[in-house]
């Protein structure tokens, strides 16, 4: 099912010795043992729970759910992310060791869903908080779609160069350990906006309460971002 190919792993000699690179060997070991941290806040997470049963058996992909972010290399977000829960999500992502990956599952996680038009307390896309590797649309996505998303992530890992990923994340960081929110231009790229750096509380602009109600359209020029 959607076999993953390594171009450098098929060079064998007559003595059955495989020649490869350390990067490909590292990718192969990581994609075969993804340990997810399950971050479910709404009904989409119920569909992921179906994968634990014998019908879909997600253990065959090496997935071992963990309850600690320090033991996980994949965080799967499912459901609505509110402004109150956003700092907790960012903190969990920061505590995960490198390299780490994110799957956004469901319409509410990707765009805010039905709450994106008139809710002042909903994050309109989890990619405004953390970088997303795989988007899984649906309301809710079926278990088969979750398996397909995991397979696509494994393919991405197999073609990845570790040094390039670390460099890209270092150049696109906008969150800090104190997780303060402020008003700034919305981003839709899945990366951290370099211009939206956190300012100390002594110099940061005070956000009036009416700001939360002013910018509540689905596509607006300003969003609450981290």
Swiss-Prot record:
EC number in record: 7.1.1.-
Membrane topology, as annotated: Peripheral membrane protein
Database matches in InterPro entries: NADH_UbQ_OxRdtase-like_20kDa, NADH_UQ_OxRdtase_20Kd_su
Record bears the keyword Thylakoid: yes
Catalytic activity, reaction form: a plastoquinone + NADH + (n+1) H(+)(in) = a plastoquinol + NAD(+) + n H(+)(out); a plastoquinone + NADPH + (n+1) H(+)(in) = a plastoquinol + NADP(+) + n H(+)(out)
Disulfide bridge positions per record: none
Coiled-coil region: none
UniProt remark on cofactor binding: Binds 1 [4Fe-4S] cluster.
GO biological-process terms attached to the record: photosynthesis, light reaction
MF GO annotations: 4 iron, 4 sulfur cluster binding; iron ion binding; NADH dehydrogenase (ubiquinone) activity; quinone binding
Cofactor: [4Fe-4S] cluster
Keyword Transcription: no
Cell compartments where the protein resides: Plastid, Chloroplast thylakoid membrane
Keyword tags: 4Fe-4S, Chloroplast, Iron, Iron-sulfur, Membrane, Metal-binding, NAD, NADP, Plastid, Plastoquinone, Quinone, Thylakoid, Translocase, Transport
Residues reported in the UniProt entry to bind [4Fe-4S] cluster: 43-44, 108, 139
Source organism superkingdom: Eukaryota
UniProt cross-references to PROSITE patterns, sorted A to Z: COMPLEX1_20K
GO CC list: chloroplast thylakoid membrane
Task performed by this protein: NDH shuttles electrons from NAD(P)H:plastoquinone, via FMN and iron-sulfur (Fe-S) centers, to quinones in the photosynthetic chain and possibly in a chloroplast respiratory chain. The immediate electron acceptor for the enzyme in this species is believed to be plastoquinone. Couples the redox reaction to proton translocation, and thus conserves the redox energy in a proton gradient.
Self-association state and partner proteins as the record states: NDH is composed of at least 16 different subunits, 5 of which are encoded in the nucleus.
Family under the similarity heading: Belongs to the complex I 20 kDa subunit family.
UniProt-recorded name of the protein: NAD(P)H-quinone oxidoreductase subunit K, chloroplastic
Organism whose genome encodes this protein: Cucumis sativus
